[in-house]
Amino acid sequence: MHKVIQSASSETDSPSVMGSGCGEGHGNGNANGSSVATNLAFTKFFFVIARADDDAHGARLRAAGGNIARGFFNDFDIDDARELQAQRFETIQFCVREGDAPADCPGPCLPQARHMVQVSSKYRPRLQEIDEELRRRIGDSAEILSLEGAFRNPRYSSAELVQYSTRNAPPRRSGRLSKNVILLPMRKTSEWWEKSALERHSYFYPHVDHNSATPVKGHALAAEKGIPALFRRVYHNPDGYERAGEFDFVSYFECDDESLPVFDQVISSLRDVRQNPEWCYVQEGPMWRGRRVLRW
């Protein structure tokens, strides 16, 4: 999220309904909301776009992956029960893109990256060290894009909504079962942040739309089908919202193969501004889809 998508090669869990940050306060601490929330831990996604995806690059990539994984728990086999036993935030997860790269994609283009790794830590400088080490090892043979995020406690407008969005939510499962990963960075428009916190919260609920004067589902009901099918997290910009040229959130999903159509249905429903007017204020970044793997 730093500088929208940071090019590392050129520069030295709280579940939600779908995770676009409707319930969060204002990131810069003005009268419409609260100050920047406490970052509990940090995460960084690295997207590797090989200049020549050949055997030589593959060997260097595997060696680099093994090196940066030292000292981290591998998330591939961590499920809900094991997460409670492990150092939850000192983790690493490797992923490989599903399908072919898009033929035409304006840069910087995350979907062009065949390989992605997510590293999480309570200590942000540790992630910068990983950034520098990865660039040192493969930066001459690949472009490396990165997104930063932070774990924060959920701040919904009611306990009822928390219960609604978590009651039937699935536990996290290992990568052998929940094989798919989907990432969607996004930002909210300035018009969104100009609204009061109370008005922003209302977009989560069924309500009467101000513009059409008709009843609409709102965010929660629009995303309802995804609650039992998708494991999800929202990562927040660690430096606050409304920062020029940066994303506010990264929505993160895991699911099995059978649930992929559910994700597509949910994102389509959320994009339908006739039922979810909140999406009028959402600017989506490039979506990345891949498979969780034990190692590169």
Regions found by a protein language model. Give the residues of each.
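A short linear hydrophobic-aromatic micro-motif
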Residues: L230-H236
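Short S/T/G/P-rich N-terminal loop/turn motif that feeds into the first structured element of a domain
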Residues: H2-L230, E242, D257-P261, V293-W296
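Alpha-helical oligomerization segments
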Residues: H236-F247, Y252-W296
